[in-house]
Amino acid sequence: MKNVNKAFRKKDAMQLVTGKPVYMDDLAPADCLIVKLYRSPHANAMVERIDTSVAKKVPGIEAIFTWEDVDQNARRYTQAGQTYPEASPYDRLVIDRHVRFVGDVVAIVVGKDEKCVEKAMKLIKVEYQVLEPVLDFHTAKDNPILVHPEDNWESLSPVGADNKRNLCAHDACGDGDIDAVLAKCDVVIDRVYHTKACQQAMMETFRTCCWMDLYGRLNILSSTQIVFHTRRNVANALHIPKSMIRVIKPRIGGGFGAKQTAVSAIYPAFVTWKTKKSCKLIFTREESQTASSPRHEMEMHVRLGATKDGIVKGIDLYTLSNTGAYGEHGPTTVGLSGHKSIPLYGKAEAFRFVSDVVYTNHMSAGAYRGYGATQGLFAVESAVNELAARLHMDPFKIREMNIVKEGDVMPAYYGAVNTSCALDRCLKKVHEMIDWDNKYPVRDLGNGKVRAVGMGMAMQGSGISGMDVGSATLKVNDDGFYSLIIGAADMGTGCDTTLAQIAAEVLDCDLDNITVFGADTDTSPYDSGSYASSTTYVTGKAVEKCALRLRGQICKLGAELLQTTEDAVDFDGKFVSLNADPEKKVSLSEVAFASQFGHMVPLEITETHTSPISPPPYMVGAAEIELDKETGEVKVVDYAACVDCGTPINPNLTRVQTEGGILQGIGMALTENITYDAKGWPMENSFMQYKIPARVDIGHIRVEFESSYEPNGPFGAKSIGEVVINTPLPAIADAIYNAIGTRFYELPITPEQVAMAVEENR
């Protein structure tokens, strides 16, 4: 192939490295008013009285909006970027009299510059009726204190939600008699695992600017993964027609799922709609840390049964998830904790998966790369590693005996057939890469330090089956170059480049001959958005279909110009020529000009794609750590990974995606953590407290690919974006066990915990 499975440079690479104006604040109108949010200091309270009279007198202040400017009985909305009807409940108002976490919005302050807005915010006086908060998610379900007692709370989808029980969702499913199967097992691992909430920590914070156009329509330029969902979110929040809203995506400085929620879009949209003036809201780093959309805290109770020979016979999983003050992505993330972990073990005769998602008075959680699978895989993979130790078996060996194979039916993965799978080859590759036989389980370096290894495996999905929609428009321009118009959002992943490669392969042209534009709700074809690992698999297939149809149209018009039939010509990317006489030909430019001069053959095609299945990508990872027994410091000195993502459309981009995901997983395993004090105040409000690993903190990260061929994907491709974050958690936890003999069931695993465990083991 000429363009697919080739390592092309990203289309926007030079723009970014040369500092061209591509981000939201670069493109915002010069006369934007500044918007700031006055936030609650209480985790649960009612606003009794708010006095903005003095604040409004500050020179330059345009407006201050409070709950009194919002109908408290109006229909609520969700900020979640999901296909309608959303699984996430409608539980928000633009400004609610009832504030539900420290950082919830009390007032919107608008002024000519940041200085006057900051001054006005200090002059706002608020009296609260402080209520007792729900801060422990273990006690939230059926707690007499309700996070959402209001009657206009609404759940559009049957997800088991009940605001009068603090339940955002409940579900139960299974296959076979799990209790009977576990009763017959020789060994049962029964453990509880806990993963804390953690931040996406993208470099560009949440930000949006808005203005009214000449036609009286609200224009929104937002750093978002979900332009079409944002349009619906804003329409629902402001109670205005979607036809009055246009949403545009600039270049995004990272998202990782955080921007699958309309965190910043609603408030400036509200201001511009009210004032008819342009404005912008840019979150500070503190706001992005304390009032955003982090990963869900989860607790997972795993019972895993096996024979004495190591065959996993049954898995029983209960997941309790903390959605925080609002329910964005709560019902959907929790499902992946089981449906993307249990199916890895193809010989299991039974499974049960029960989940509850509860409201608390913590910051609202949301989408983060891995989307619940990360938490569930930490639990299930850690249980399998403990099973291997109990049976004195090698962790690689026990997985080789149990893994799902190509062609298997996966009851825990919605009964789907495993259409493509190279998991067995990934296991062998990583075993070789990390030199497992010579390093497992631990080596003493003789200086108070040891080196140990651990491993884990993972699966994810490729889009949301039967729901996600990807679309593309392709057209030939008048001198023979192509425009590819998409609704998917490139947030640094390089999907503009990847999708162009797919089109170029079909059209047999150079990658530079395709320009990519998106995403804009007025001009782009509908796309669900860049989330759920859907872009390459779903939108990429739409691009492939679109390019195939356009190729046919080029041949049809070329045949007209050559005065023959369509089946008598061929197109080589540059010329349409007669099969019988290749010297008789017309160039693509001539065909393009002809389409604009007296011919009725359109050279602009739009195609849409949705998939009834979501074929899983697979990954195996192994970590080698160096552990200092005196200080408890753990450093990952080597990480070996092998991914099956089907055909890698662009190996360079898939490699850096994998490296970045591994780095995030290492952070979640060792340092990243959101904690609260006794009153519900978040403790990590900057990168001084919230520690993300830098490149200098990590040793080698090595990535290889073992490609299966997915027949339903473009050129055999599956997804890559999310599966890559999942393996470091169980791998590092197991390596620490191999180093010091203590298992940890809660993340992150800190140096203090490790040092104390070493001391206890002496």
Place the predicted regions along the sequence by residue.
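Extended active-site and interfacial segments that coordinate phosphate-rich ligands
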Residues: 14-15, 122-129, 133-135, 225, ...
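Helix-loop-helix junctions that connect adjacent transmembrane helices in secondary transporters/permeases
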Residues: 147-238, 403-481, 683-704
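Glycine-rich loop/linker segments at domain edges
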Residues: 6, 12-18, 82-85, 161-208, ...
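C-terminal catalytic domains of large/alpha subunits in multi-subunit enzymes
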Residues: 67-68, 239-244, 274-279, 308, ...
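Catalytic phosphate/nucleotide-handling subdomain of diverse soluble enzymes
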Residues: 462-524, 539
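Short acidic, glycine/serine/threonine-rich loops at helix termini
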Residues: 74-79, 120-123, 222, 231-233, ...
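Thiamine diphosphate
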Residues: 232, 253-276, 280-281, 495-503
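Flexible, low-hydrophobicity surface segments
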Residues: 1-162, 188, 274
